Amino acid sequence: MTQQLKFILTREEAASKGVSRPSDLVKLEEEAMILARAPISGVQDAVLGLASSDRIFLGVNVEFEGLPLHHSISAEQFLVANLALNFEQELHACLIPSRFYLESFEEDVPLLLVPQNNRLAHSDPFSAAEICSNPEHCSHLKCRALTAANKSNAQYSKCPSGVALICEGEVYGGWCIESAAYNLSLGPVQAALVDFMARGEGKGFEMITGAVLVEMNDAKVSQEATARILLKTIAPGCNFSVFRCHKTAEN
């Protein structure tokens, strides 16, 4: 039986593949490329990052069949989301095989990986009353989407948002990761799909059966329309719901 390819490698797993230092990351290039999903362009891309935990994280490009390429996830976006979703705070080195260079990072923690607490709560009192005492690990999409929104990095729009997906009883989450200029932002659905690909053992997007988006009441930038388009196309049987939230006062 072929071993399931992974998006995160421990130090021991990397060593078994002959990777013991940053310059060895190139040895993982072919394995990383296989994980890309590019049904439109056919161009597979990958980046590899060495985190402060000594784990190696993979990022690949993801295209969604039937949707314009601007809905896609770039390999760099995938890598950043993979790091953030796994609570890594430092990226020590990054190999970008398709552009043939190794970048080392010796400066402070990248802003996108700084943990956030947006102090959000559900605006609907019934929804607020249903939030579990341990929303990080419960199976309720409403709880998990709010938890994701609270981690959202929305430094430009000031409109944090989070998404939770469910497939065969397993919940996957993601949040908006904003950037500007030539660095494209990543929406909460795409970030949740990174989590789905990284932990979903190769399942297809069409197997996703439920999704919840949580975003601000008065958001000047809403994720709802984009989320509906994306989910309707890749997971036609998915039940999609939206809940509003507001920012609470600081303690």
Swiss-Prot record:
Residues at which substrate binds: 61-63
Protein encoded by which gene: CDA4
GO molecular function: cytidine deaminase activity; zinc ion binding
GO BP of this protein: cytidine deamination
A family per Pfam: dCMP_cyt_deam_2
InterPro entries assigned to the protein according to its UniProt record, in alphabetical order: CMP_dCMP_dom, Cyd/dCyd_deaminase_Zn-bd, Cyt/Deoxycyt_deaminase, Cytidine_deaminase-like
Family the entry assigns: Belongs to the cytidine and deoxycytidylate deaminase family.
Active site: 76 (proton donor)
Official protein name in the record: Probable inactive cytidine deaminase 4
Subunit structure, as described in the record: Homodimer.
UniProt cross-references to PROSITE patterns, sorted A to Z: CYT_DCMP_DEAMINASES_2
Domain of life: Eukaryota
Cited Gene3D superfamilies: Cytidine Deaminase, domain 2
Domain CMP/dCMP-type deaminase: start-end pairs: 136-251
